[in-house]
């Protein structure tokens, strides 16, 4: 298994921070259509640094967005499997 280089770890940190903060904003161009410019950051970083970086940036950045926005961390909360309360 390859180790993560310092360059890749820094790119993941910067990408996740940008994606997490900018993921809070977007704009509507038509009814039921919402565009988030932060998705471009995820696409560019994934193309430049590879799929592992893209996966980690998306996972960490989306968790940051959900936490800052007050929606909370949702993954792993399936009441039928884990008896986890949804409220």
From Swiss-Prot:
Gene3D superfamilies in the cross-refs: 1.10.1760.20
Keyword Magnesium: no
Membrane-protein topology: Multi-pass membrane protein
Chief location: membrane
Swiss-Prot/TrEMBL keywords: Cell membrane, Membrane, Transmembrane, Transmembrane helix
Compartment annotation: Cell membrane
Residues passing through the membrane, by range: 9-29, 40-60
A Pfam family it matches: ECF-ribofla_trS
InterPro entries: ECF_substrate-spec-like
Highest taxon of the lineage: Bacteria
Gene Ontology cellular component annotations, sorted alphabetically: plasma membrane
Similarity-based family: Belongs to the UPF0397 family.
Protein name, UniProt field: Putative UPF0397 protein BC_2624
Taxon lineage: Bacteria, Bacillati, Bacillota, Bacilli, Bacillales
């Amino acid at each position: 298994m390859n180790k993560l280089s310092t360059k890749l770890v820094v790119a993941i940190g910067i990408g996740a921070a940008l994606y997490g903060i900018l993921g809070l904003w977007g704009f509507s161009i038509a009814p039921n259509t919402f565009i988030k410019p932060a998705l471009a950051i995820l696409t560019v970083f994934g193309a430049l640094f590879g799929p592992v970086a893209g996966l980690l940036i998306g996972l960490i950045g989306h968790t940051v967005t959900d936490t800052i926005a007050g929606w909370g961390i949702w993954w792993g909360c399936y009441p039928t499997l884990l008896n986890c309360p949804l409220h």
